[in-house]
Amino acid sequence: LTHPAALFKIRAVQASDAAAWRQLRRALWPHADDIEHARDIARQLDAPARHACFIASPPGILAPVGFAEVAVRHDDVNGCGASPVLFLEGVFVEPAARRRGVARALCAAAAAWGTARGCAAFASDAPLENAASHALHRALGFDKTERVVFFRKPLAR
């Protein structure tokens, strides 16, 4: 795929996109099974005021090569002082379509959607060890706010 991002069609997903969306989600989150992906997709489609997913397709090709999922959050989001916040739950572009501005175009569509819903900021997170994700976030204009390690301790029942 040699097309610049301007040629990619960016649009909000519809229920009819569920199979292609699930395939892209599998590539980003391979640890989740198809039941979990189907449940997440249904939950997002059932709450269009809170969730959105945008997909990118190259010219003349129906199958999407990338997606960005976002959610409007009203809780405390690290590094954001105001609410609501648009949160990037996940962004993925197939390797053959990367470095062409597709992720940027997907996130721009998501940001416009969040702005229309009154979001004060666009936030995201990434594992500490995922340097590629950190680089992508910086390239998309995100500023690092915190580095966090989560802990847990089981409680006896």
Language-model region placement:
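Conserved beta-strand-loop-alpha-helix junction that forms the acyl-donor binding cleft
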Residues: 123-133, 152
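Conserved GNAT acetyl-CoA-binding A-motif
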Residues: 114-126
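Active-site rim helix/loop that mediates acceptor-substrate recognition in acyltransferases
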Residues: 32-55, 69
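A short beta-loop-alpha structural element at the N-terminal edge
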Residues: 8-21
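Helix-loop element at the rim of GNAT/NAT acetyltransferase active sites that forms part
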Residues: 22-36, 76
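Conserved acetyl-CoA-binding loop of GNAT-fold acetyltransferases
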Residues: 119, 138-147
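Conserved acetyl-CoA-binding loop-helix of GNAT-fold acetyltransferases
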Residues: 93, 99-112, 135, 139
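Conserved beta-strand in the GNAT
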Residues: 55, 63-72, 87, 92
